[in-house]
């Protein structure tokens, strides 16, 4: 009798875990100092005023305010935080 042995399992069925990259706070949203604004690989968005750049290129707020995205003449998009004028107590 002609029989064919089992061929083994498929070589597919693996995938990497998603990294949850992207914009976390959009333009006009209020942020607190330390809030993450963008998670990225490389500098798709560049740091502007009142933001910091982490070693993994994460852009985060250094002051309280609202997020703004601006594209300059060089074609780069800069992320800034416009500080809110706090009322004197």
From Swiss-Prot:
Does the record's keyword annotation contain Ribosomal protein?
yes
Q: Tell me which species this is from.
A: Brucella anthropi (strain ATCC 49188 / DSM 6882 / CCUG 24695 / JCM 21032 / LMG 3331 / NBRC 15819 / NCTC 12168 / Alc 37)
Region listing for Disordered, in residue ranges: 1-21
Q: Belongs to which family?
A: Belongs to the bacterial ribosomal protein bL27 family.
An example GO BP is: translation
Keyword field contains Ribonucleoprotein: yes
What's the name of its gene?
rpmA
Which keywords does UniProt give here?
Ribonucleoprotein, Ribosomal protein
The record's HAMAP family line, in alphabetical order, gives: Ribosomal_bL27
The name on file for this protein is Large ribosomal subunit protein bL27
The GO cellular component terms are: cytosolic large ribosomal subunit
Signal sequence span is none
What Gene Ontology molecular function terms does this protein carry? Answer: structural constituent of ribosome
Q: Which domain of life is it from?
A: Bacteria
């Amino acid at each position: 009798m002609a029989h064919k042995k089992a061929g083994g399992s498929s070589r597919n069925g693996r995938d990497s875990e998603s990294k949850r990259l992207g914009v976390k706070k959009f333009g006009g949203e209020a942020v607190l100092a330390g809030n993450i604004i963008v998670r990225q690989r490389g500098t798709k968005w560049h740091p502007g005023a009142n933001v910091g750049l982490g070693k993994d290129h994460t852009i985060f707020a250094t002051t309280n305010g609202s997020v703004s995205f601006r594209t300059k003449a060089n074609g780069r998009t800069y992320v800034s935080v416009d500080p809110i004028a706090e009322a004197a107590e």
